[in-house]
Amino acid sequence: MTGAQPPQGEAMPIASHLFIVEATVPPGIEEDWNRWYNEVHLPEIGDCPGFLSAQRYVCEDASGRRYVAIYELESPEAIRSAEFAARRGWAQFTGQVEFRSGVFSKIAGYAPTRG
């Protein structure tokens, strides 16, 4: 990803909001989907104003291939920007991928101290 990184030794900001996208991908397009998502889509969405980070995961025990992308946001306004609107969508995969998405607001957090 090409987004800004914190200086060495500093932590990334802790997001108050997450934008989560879950997708079920047919096996016949999975390789092309992953290449496009990892190399094109994730960086272009992650570089939108108000996006702090972007990661993808695959479900280890799913029947069918389920993926999730988790974007940390400064605020829910990030997904309402013109830049995001211009970059969102599934490109050539439109109509082939089942998905759902939502913005989640942080209600609690915990980070263990290690020593």
Label for each model-derived stretch:
Residues 2-115:
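Macromolecular interaction modules
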